[in-house]
Curated annotation (Swiss-Prot):
Signal peptide: none annotated. This is Austinoid biosynthesis clusters protein J. InterPro entries: Fungal_Meroterpenoid_Isomerase. In A.calidoustus, the austinoid gene cluster lies on a contiguous DNA region, while clusters from E.nidulans and P.brasilianum are split in their respective genomes. Genetic rearrangements provoked variability among the clusters and E.nidulans produces the least number of austionoid derivatives with the end products austinol and dehydroaustinol, while P.brasilianum can produce until acetoxydehydroaustin, and A.calidoustus produces the highest number of identified derivatives. Homodimer. Pathway: Secondary metabolite biosynthesis; terpenoid biosynthesis. Part of the gene cluster B that mediates the biosynthesis of austinol and dehydroaustinol, two fungal meroterpenoids. The first step of the pathway is the synthesis of 3,5-dimethylorsellinic acid by the polyketide synthase ausA. 3,5-dimethylorsellinic acid is then prenylated by the polyprenyl transferase ausN. Further epoxidation by the FAD-dependent monooxygenase ausM and cyclization by the probable terpene cyclase ausL lead to the formation of protoaustinoid A. It comes from Emericella nidulans (strain FGSC A4 / ATCC 38163 / CBS 112.46 / NRRL 194 / M139). PANTHER family: AUSTINOID BIOSYNTHESIS CLUSTERS PROTEIN F-RELATED (PTHR39598:SF1), AUSTINOL SYNTHESIS PROTEIN F-RELATED (PTHR39598). Gene3D superfamilies: 3.10.450.50. Disruption phenotype: Impairs the synthesis of austinol and dehydroaustinol and accumulates the intermediate compound preaustinoid A3.
Length: 162
């Protein structure tokens, strides 16, 4: 049975698989051409990036990772809103980087396209203390990261209300 719920969950599953793959082409293929990815942590930095900005910045981020695992923390906690075409995922990552281990937890809210086969919008929430620790270690090793990297990388406006 190919219900809306089934299609939403299948797309969310592919989203998670592409994040774990660290394959930027696969990561962007699951997204619509107009997808916006909102980083939603006001105590750290709020910003939104386009697919082009993701493609541009990703190689620099990937270069810091030597081993990576990403996945859903608890399948029973996945929430689906069929009418809004949204799926919420609680996920975790465990990575070895050029400056030591990095572990974090995330909540992703994915809004799918009308056909439920691609992601139109991503809201990402994460533990800012853990990310800040990684950033400090990267900076101490003189490794630029993310939006502070020297690559041409500008952000769009803050995310709209969920």
């Amino acid at each position: 049975m190919n219900t809306t719920r089934h299609r939403l969950l299948a797309t969310a599953s592919r989203f998670v698989e592409t994040l774990e793959s660290l394959d930027v082409d696969a990561m962007l293929a699951i997204r619509s051409s107009t997808c916006l990815h909102h980083m939603c942590c006001p105590s750290f930095r709020n910003y939104s990036i386009t697919n082009d900005q993701t493609r541009e910045a990703f190689p620099q981020w990937k270069a810091t990772i030597t081993k990576y695992k990403f996945g859903v923390l608890d399948d029973s906690q996945i929430l689906v809103d069929e009418q809004a075409r949204k799926v919420m995922i609680h996920a975790e990552t465990a990575a070895e980087t050029t400056v030591g281990d990095y572990n974090n937890e995330y909540v992703f809210i994915l809004r799918m396209a009308e056909d439920c086969n691609t992601v139109d919008e991503i809201w990402e929430f994460y533990d800012t203390i853990r990310l800040q620790d990684l950033r400090h270690r990267l900076e101490a090793s003189h490794v630029p990261i993310g939006v502070d990297a020297p690559a041409p990388f500008t952000t769009t406006a803050s995310p709209a209300a969920l």
